[in-house]
Amino acid sequence: MKPVFKEQELVDVMEVIETTDLMDLVVFNDDVNTFDHVIQTLIRVCKHTNEQAEQCTLIIHYKGKCTVKNGTFDFLRPFRDAICEVGIDAKIV
């Protein structure tokens, strides 16, 4: 016997599952860390390309913050911890 589901119900359930698990790793601007330090940290920790790291760093500088990675909390925690260990302010939101 086949379960009876409407296609829209399945899509709605899948959207809820996908959106509730995803979180953002956000890096915040400060007056202490240099551009080079933030860029090198994003390359080393988040595996960004040089261009990605530079763009994120400029956004952090001009906008005050930038999302540098997405994923579940458990996935993002080691990235956040490594970024914070080198003195850069990062939070999972």
Q: What are these regions, as identified by a protein language model?
A:
Residues 1-93:
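Terminal domain-initiation and capping elements
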